[in-house]
UniProtKB/Swiss-Prot annotation:
Record-listed ATP binding positions: K331
Keywords on record: Aminoacyl-tRNA synthetase, ATP-binding, Cytoplasm, Ligase, Nucleotide-binding, Protein biosynthesis
Originating organism: Encephalitozoon cuniculi (strain GB-M1) (Microsporidian parasite)
Cellular compartments annotated: Cytoplasm
Domain of life of the source: Eukaryota
InterPro entries: aa-tRNA-synth_I_CS, Anticodon_Met, Met-tRNA_ligase_1, Met-tRNA_synth, Methionyl/Leucyl_tRNA_Synth, MetRS_core, MetRS_Zn, Rossmann-like_a/b/a_fold
Catalytic activity: tRNA(Met) + L-methionine + ATP = L-methionyl-tRNA(Met) + AMP + diphosphate
Residue interval(s) of motif 'HIGH' region: 10-20
Xref: Pfam families: Anticodon_3 (PF19303), tRNA-synt_1g (PF09334)
Protein known as: Probable methionine--tRNA ligase, cytoplasmic
GO terms classed as biological process: methionyl-tRNA aminoacylation
Cellular component, GO, one term: aminoacyl-tRNA synthetase multienzyme complex
Main location: cytoplasm
Length: 550
């Protein structure tokens, strides 16, 4: 079965921080590379989410149009992902004509099937600004947790969603004045009608979701579903227009149009084969835990409401939050590392950052914490002393003592035990990757390196078979080079280049290399941080400008 792999669409009002990167695009990239390395037919798709109130607010604050914000920040996002070597098969954007057409088409199917109703509601209205206050245009105190920065549709602090009129002490986000309440008519989606279908979805696929995703779904499905308002009154009408005459001045709620973006980008990529992909592709999705409810409840219900065959989530991997130095990332307080901080290379190479973010990937049910001290220690201990030392030591020995020729003696019981140990670890690696436990799979690769180092150390004491030990260690390096491809692909290629080995699919077991001439240009895989880089890291111990819009 083909795999349709997606990462939660990054919102384009700002550049991504480290938590955004590990939570969706980097995790999706690792899994996509793994699937392709297995020989599976798969596509990895993402793109920028460009509609909604956050974009309008940013445009108002900067005195430009929403489109200008999107076009500028879209390039910044792609620049960051390119630096991280994220290998999308397609990266699109939701403000395209193709997306508008598909959203309107799917809506009309849902509407014609009777799953929307017109409801007159009361909504906050700012008389000073002359507009209805939807979502981020209204802020106030959350009635659930008391946070004073809750938005009109959701509290980022506790995760609750609600009607904006439930906010306490509401105020306009633009001018801070107190709003009045006015009547307006919107379109509401009958979510409750799809409870049985959603329960069946969970029974069928829920065991393939990360534990936190399962917990969130069960929490939602235990509650009463209220009709969901799927249209908005916005100042610039920045969104997909509602294709009904009565609602021509309104646009769709961003969480209605954004997930359809996955289908838009798939359609833009595969063209006439779109229908076939919709029929038999397995949808695998990566996201932070705050997006789980939209992807396991609301979006699947929308697809069911069309009455047609579209891929619904089969596998889902959701991360917990990544903190920065024991605090939440904050754009307003300039707390954390953001994408453009890394692009210049002043804080280290991308392979180091890929490795460390995946090492601390918050894939259990607990948040993870980024610290520069642990980052530096991990690079030194894992990449330089373990992986780098193992590769360099073996290759340098074969180059200088064996004339770059890998030549084995007859395998003895100790050799066979080492091979058995490595193959057991390789099986564990494959199992963890299938479970999308990426952090644990990466740990297994480091275990293989440690086992290889132990084996080589045994060989140092053997006068007659010392060269043989190093030559068998070469086979371990070849396997490690392949297994690292999903995680740190540039390093993987460098290992294979020095070994003079071709890129291959994942083997059934470790291939024993004999009678082979390795490469001649052997270099250290990693270099320690420079004094300048360490000094640059120290700058982030205090508030810094991220170089992005607030």
């Amino acid at each position: 079965m083909k795999k349709f792999i997606t990462s939660a669409l990054p919102y384009v009002n700002n550049q991504p921080h480290l938590g955004n990167i590990i939570g969706s695009v980097l995790s999706g990239d690792v899994y996509s590379r793994y699937c392709k390395k297995k020989g599976e037919v798969s596509v990895y798709i993402c793109g920028t989410d460009e509609y909604g109130t956050a974009i309008e607010m940013e445009a108002i604050s900067q005195g430009v149009t929403p489109l200008e914000i999107c076009e500028k920040n879209r390039k910044l996002h792609k620049q960051v992902y390119d630096w991280f070597n994220i290998d999308f098969d397609y990266f699109g954007f939701t403000s395209s004509a193709t997306h508008t057409g598909l959203v309107q088409d799917l809506f009309m199917k849902m509407y014609d099937n009777g799953h929307f109703s017109e409801v007159e509601i009361e909504q906050f209205y700012c008389e000073h600004c002359g507009l209805f206050l939807a979502d981020r245009f209204i802020v106030g105190e959350c009635k659930f947790c008391g946070d004073g920065r809750a938005r009109g549709d959701q509290c980022d602090s506790c995760g609750h969603t609600y009607n904006s009129l439930e906010l306490l002490s509401p105020r306009c986000s633009i001018c801070s004045s107190s709003p009045v309440v006015r009547a307006t008519t919107h379109l509401f989606f009958d979510l409750e009608a799809f409870r049985p279908s959603l329960e069946e979805l969970y029974r069928t696929n829920g065991h393939l979701w990360s534990q936190n995703a399962q917990n969130i779904f069960r929490q939602w499905i235990s509650m009463e579903f209220y009709p969901r308002c799927m249209t908005r009154d916005l100042k610039f009408n920045w969104g997909v227009p509602v294709p009904l005459e009565k609602f021509k001045e309104k646009v769709f709620y961003v969480w209605f149009d954004a997930p359809i973006g996955y289908l838009t980008f798939l359609k833009e990529l595969v063209g006439e084969d779109f229908g076939e992909w919709c029929k038999d592709a397995e949808l695998v999705q990566f996201m932070g835990k705050d997006n789980v409810a939209f992807h396991t409840v609301i979006f699947p219900a929308m697809l069911y409401a069309t009455g047609e065959k579209y891929p619904v989530v089969r596998r889902l991997s959701a991360t917990e939050y990544l903190q920065f130095e024991n605090e939440k990332f904050s754009k307003s307080r300039r707390h954390g590392i953001f994408g453009l901080d890394l692009v210049g290379g002043g804080l280290g190479k991308s392979c180091m950052w890929r490795y460390y973010l995946l090492k601390i990937r918050p894939e259990s049910t607990k948040d993870s914490n980024f610290t520069f001290s642990d980052f530096r220690q991990s690079v030194t201990a894992d990449l330089i002393n373990n992986l780098g030392n193992f590769v360099n030591r073996v290759l340098k020995y074969i180059q200088s003592k064996c004339n770059s020729r890998v030549s084995l003696l007859e395998l003895d019981s100790g050799d066979k035990k080492c091979i058995e140990d490595v193959n057991e670890l390789y099986c564990k690696y494959k199992a963890k990757m299938e479970e999308i436990k990426l952090r644990e799979a990466l740990q297994v690769v480091m275990e293989i390196c440690r086992r290889g180092n132990e084996y080589i150390q045994e060989g140092v004491r053997s006068r007659d078979r010392k060269g043989h030990f190093f030559c068998l260690g070469f086979s371990i390096i070849g396997l490690v080079g392949t297994l690292l491809h999903p995680f740190i692909p540039v390093t993987s290629l460098e290992i294979l280049r020095m070994c003079n080995l071709e890129e291959t699919m994942f083997p059934e077991s470790m291939r024993i290399v004999d009678g082979h001439t390795m490469g001649s240009d052997i270099r250290p895989l990693f270099e320690d941080f420079t004094t300048e880089q360490i000094e640059e890291m120290k700058r982030y111990d205090r508030p810094q400008s991220t170089g992005c819009s607030k």
